[in-house]
């Protein structure tokens, strides 16, 4: 049986020999430095036409060894399927691409073991910088990575007492403001449904709720559910919570998926929004806008946060700025029908 010979992959040396020009000239042209090196348009066009005809593709790993750069940024989030993280990834990718970088992204599903594996994968790929939504327990690995000089920006959450760069939401104040809004609308028995987690953003949201209800001398009603719990089980837990706490007249959900499952639970109990119970949910999503009645949400400034993330990282990659950036951005309460003024009974 005849096996065709594998087509030889051309190198810069081959191109230089074929065109009878120096290897350095070919290298400068391929790296977009024709003008900088005053290489004639004729020679540049000659090289570009040739590589197009032969289908030349540069060895990116070899280039990274020469330049010390891959022009790839590693983006690690909790779940790329989550609308919040997918929107963030979209904006980061757009801004990175405009600046000559590509994004390699992945999901941790909040697993420490998976996070460690993915972090090693990024290192093996020689990414230039990291944007990370860290799982619990990843602090030591992040600190080691930062000590190598690699630019690392944390997103959505950070580590207490850490010295990392980060861009996060003001979770405490955002939740505090949500409680304030409900109180102003006449609601007094306000519950908080959240994830059983030590992550900084979840803790800050819980603390914001607790501080606000304490300020108004109201009762605490907190329901925590597991992060990896199936949707139907989350719904069942919220149904049980509402059934046991019939005095509740308002609920705040600390994540988008808790908000969606909370609406299912409320529907199962045939409760009316907002007549029987008012609702506020993190984060802004078309589902909440289209729901009848429409749902009040706590919106994170996704585009502004994404721009901050990529700008800080690009500055660090260009060695323009070595100071630490700790950016906390305000949330916005999008008031809709689900928190209409409570009718006096």
Give residue ranges: language-model regions:
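Flexible loop/hinge segments that line or gate small-molecule binding clefts
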Residues: 110, 132-177, 257, 283-295
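N-terminal helix-turn-helix DNA-binding module of bacterial transcription factors
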Residues: 1-69
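Short beta-strand segments enriched in small/hydrophobic residues
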Residues: 23-28, 65-79, 181, 189-196
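Amphipathic helical "hinge" segments at domain boundaries
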Residues: 2, 41, 45, 54-129, ...
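Short, well-structured alpha-helical segments in soluble
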Residues: 113-126, 233-247
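Hinge/beta->alpha junction and helix N-cap segments in small-molecule ligand-binding domains
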Residues: 77-86, 106-114, 166-177, 193-237, ...
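Flexible loop/turn connectors
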Residues: 220, 235-345
